């Protein structure tokens, strides 16, 4: 019997390969949309609530990534993500500070796709004329009801949907048999599971998206505004020079 890490490695890589096959056509459609935005001097905005903020941050100020990616950051870390209206106010405040401009792109990330804040941020961005890309688990989204008053999920309000392919509950490795004695709940699952995949696959999908954008920029002979690791000689100066063009538009200051 394989160990738990071996089981995770095998299953997670299967899901990663499936995510590539599922999302490749969507990524191909998105590359020119994001590429044209970058070529015009526009900004790619991201938002993820709760743990999904970690996925969002993967492409913000990232070595090897685009300088023009920035993020809407929730100061409550998702604690009140289901308070109706909070996401709208969060997006509006960010809009006042950094601007959400027509023709730009918002990537909204929510594994469940059911929580209010990502839906409201996406709706605000669409009203401002941005292209909205959702990164979610369609299986998880379909398995749970929406928390938003409209009853809609994130995938319902997006222009394009990327599916991280995570299973409902996110975890994929059976850890131990559940207690099936008389004391066990009648609704207890047959096993406990660990090893979530939404972060692993979500970050991979976003990196595929960034690389597809760079591929389009390269093929169309546009500059490639790629950040360098600040730990390399001369990188800080290089990154600051790139960021000058976006002064006031980036929510995360570069070193």
PLM segments and residue spans:
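Generic N-terminal amphipathic, Lys/Arg-enriched alpha-helix
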Residues: 1-21
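Amphipathic, non-membrane alpha-helical segments in soluble helical-bundle scaffolds
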Residues: 2, 24-27, 31, 199, ...
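Glycine-rich phosphate-binding loops that contact phosphosugars or nucleotide phosphates
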Residues: 39-211
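Flexible, glycine/charged-enriched surface loops at secondary-structure junctions
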Residues: 22-29, 44-46, 218-227
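Short, glycine-rich nucleotide/cofactor-binding loops
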Residues: 16-26, 106-115
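YjeF_N-associated NAD(P)HX repair module
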Residues: 180-182, 190-253
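A short, well-structured juxtamembrane/interface segment
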Residues: 22-37, 90
């Amino acid at each position: 019997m394989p160990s738990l890490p071996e089981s995770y490695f095998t299953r997670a890589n299967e899901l990663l390969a499936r995510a590539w096959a599922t999302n490749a056509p969507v990524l191909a459609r998105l590359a020119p949309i994001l590429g044209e935005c970058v070529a015009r001097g526009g900004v790619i905005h991201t938002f993820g609530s709760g743990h999904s903020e970690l996925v969002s941050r993967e492409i913000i100020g990232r070595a090897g990534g685009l300088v023009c990616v920035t993020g809407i950051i929730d100061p409550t870390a998702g604690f009140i993500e289901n308070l109706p209206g909070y996401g709208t106010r969060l997006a509006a405040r960010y809009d006042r500070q950094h601007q959400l401009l027509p023709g730009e792109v918002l990537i909204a990330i929510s594994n469940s796709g059911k929580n209010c804040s990502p839906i409201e941020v996406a709706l605000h961005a669409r009203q401002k004329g941005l292209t909205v890309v959702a990164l979610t688990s369609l299986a998880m989204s379909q398995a749970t009801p929406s928390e938003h008053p409209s009853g809609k999920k994130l995938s319902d309000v997006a222009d394009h949907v990327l599916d991280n392919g995570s299973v409902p509950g996110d975890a994929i490795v059976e850890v131990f048999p559940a207690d099936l004695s008389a004391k066990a709940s009648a609704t207890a699952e047959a096993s406990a599971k660990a090893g979530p995949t939404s972060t692993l696959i979500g970050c991979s999908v976003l990196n595929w998206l960034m690389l597809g954008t760079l591929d389009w920029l390269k093929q169309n002979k546009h500059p490639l505004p790629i950040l360098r690791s600040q730990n390399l000689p001369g990188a800080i100066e290089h990154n600051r020079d790139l960021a000058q063009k976006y002064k006031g538009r980036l929510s995360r200051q570069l070193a």
